[in-house]
Amino acid sequence: MSYTLPSLPYAYDALEPHFDKQTMEIHHTKHHQTYVNNANAALESLPEFANLPVEELITKLDQLPADKKTVLRNNAGGHANHSLFWKGLKKGTTLQGDLKAAIERDFGSVDNFKAEFEKAAASRFGSGWAWLVLKGDKLAVVSTANQDSPLMGEAISGASGFPIMGLDVWEHAYYLKFQNRRPDYIKEFWNVVNWDEAAARFAAKK
């Protein structure tokens, strides 16, 4: 089984004016496609791993041959992270229900959660991601470098937990529109969070 680039459930301009069409198209068809291609190439000689869903593969990095571990950490990680990212974007959804209640319980308020998430995203040096994760029965905000995922575990990524939502803070995710203004990009994210997807992921794991 080869990994394939997932189709987006919306047009490239669907998130305007918050996330621009050009960035979305390049990000999806160029950057994400490259992660898919590189992961598939690395897996050609690893048939015992090639049929695993990418979310499962990245939990087994310590089982990979040493010469494949880094390339798959980066590229299978990139494929998994971006696949989640695209599904997590949609205009016009509302934070409500069990997920909202859990955020208020674990962060004190929605505003406190947003402030903590924005800080994690803005302070991640270089390239990486900010995440809302479920650890056991508690929500937490974490960040990872490069294309690391919380699914890789603390020993590899420095974070753990089941991702509920994530924000890509690589420059390729925002530079065409926001240049070096990462905090502005992070603020715009709240206008396109797919809270329905986040709630579904939370409900599946709580």
From Swiss-Prot:
Q: What does this protein do?
A: Destroys superoxide anion radicals which are normally produced within the cells and which are toxic to biological systems.
Q: Which GO terms describe its biological process?
A: cellular response to selenium ion; removal of superoxide radicals; response to acidic pH; response to heat; response to oxidative stress; superoxide metabolic process
Instruction: Give the cofactors, semicolon-separated.
Output: Mn(2+)
Q: Record the organism.
A: Escherichia coli (strain K12)
| Subunit details | Homodimer.
Looking up InterPro entries in the UniProt record yields:
Mn/Fe_SOD, Mn/Fe_SOD_BS, Mn/Fe_SOD_C, Mn/Fe_SOD_N, Mn/Fe_SOD_N_sf, SOD_C_sf
| A molecular function (GO) term | antioxidant activity
**GO-annotated cellular components:** cytoplasm; cytosol
Catalytic reaction(s) noted: 2 superoxide + 2 H(+) = H2O2 + O2
Protein residues bound to Mn(2+): H27, H82, D168, H172
Q: Which cysteines are joined by disulfide bonds?
A: none
Please provide the record's keywords in A-Z order.
Manganese, Metal-binding, Oxidoreductase
**One Pfam family matching this protein:** Sod_Fe_N
In the Enzyme Commission scheme, what number(s) does this protein have? Answer: 1.15.1.1
Q: Which family does it belong to?
A: Belongs to the iron/manganese superoxide dismutase family.
- The protein here is known as Superoxide dismutase [Mn]
The cofactor binding remark recorded in the entry reads: Binds 1 Mn(2+) ion per subunit.
- Its top-level enzyme class, in one word, is oxidoreductase
